[in-house]
C-alpha cells in the first residue's frame, strides 16, 4: 500500500489536488504525484518512480 495514499501499490487512485502518491497511479490530480516531477509533466498521472527529491522521475526524464 502507498504510504501516502489509501490505494494498493501499483493501483490507481483519484486524489485531490494535494496528491502525494508515490507507489500508486493517480488518475485525477493535475499536479505532479512525485516531488521530483515538474508540475507540467502530462505523463505523471500514468505513474512514475521517484528515487529522491533531487532525482528526475522515470516518466519525465
UniProtKB/Swiss-Prot annotation:
InterPro entries documented for this protein: Metalthion_dom_sf, Metalthion_dom_sf_vert, Metalthion_vert, Metalthion_vert_metal_BS
Highest taxon above the source species: Eukaryota
Similarity annotation: Belongs to the metallothionein superfamily. Type 1 family.
GO molecular function term, any single one: metal ion binding
Binding site for a divalent metal cation 7: 50, 57, 59-60
Subunit structure: Monomer.
Binding residues for a divalent metal cation 5: 34, 36-37, 50
Free-text comment about domains: Class I metallothioneins contain 2 metal-binding domains: four divalent ions are chelated within cluster A of the alpha domain and are coordinated via cysteinyl thiolate bridges to 11 cysteine ligands. Cluster B, the corresponding region within the beta domain, can ligate three divalent ions to 9 cysteines.
Name of the protein in question: Metallothionein-1A
Alpha: region residues: 30-61
Region (Beta): 1-29
Function in brief: Metallothioneins have a high content of cysteine residues that bind various heavy metals; these proteins are transcriptionally regulated by both heavy metals and glucocorticoids.
Modified residues (Phosphoserine): 58
Binding-site positions, a divalent metal cation 3: 15, 19, 24, 29
Entry binding sites for a divalent metal cation 4: 33-34, 44, 48
UniProt xrefs under PANTHER family: METALLOTHIONEIN (PTHR23299), METALLOTHIONEIN-1G (PTHR23299:SF22)
Annotated positions binding a divalent metal cation 1: 5, 7, 21, 24
Binding site for a divalent metal cation 6: 37, 41, 44, 60
Keyword terms of this UniProt record: Acetylation, Metal-binding, Metal-thiolate cluster, Phosphoprotein
Covalent S-S links between cysteines: none
Binding residues annotated for a divalent metal cation 2, in chain numbering: 7, 13, 15, 26
GO CC annotation, single: nucleus
Amino acid at each position: 500500500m502507498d504510504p501516502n495514499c489509501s490505494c494498493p501499490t501499483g493501483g490507481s487512485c483519484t486524489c485531490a489536488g494535494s496528491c502525494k502518491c508515490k507507489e500508486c497511479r493517480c488518475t485525477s490530480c493535475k499536479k505532479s504525484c512525485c516531488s521530483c516531477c515538474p508540475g507540467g509533466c502530462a505523463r505523471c498521472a500514468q505513474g512514475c518512480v521517484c528515487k529522491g527529491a533531487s532525482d528526475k522521475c522515470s516518466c519525465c526524464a
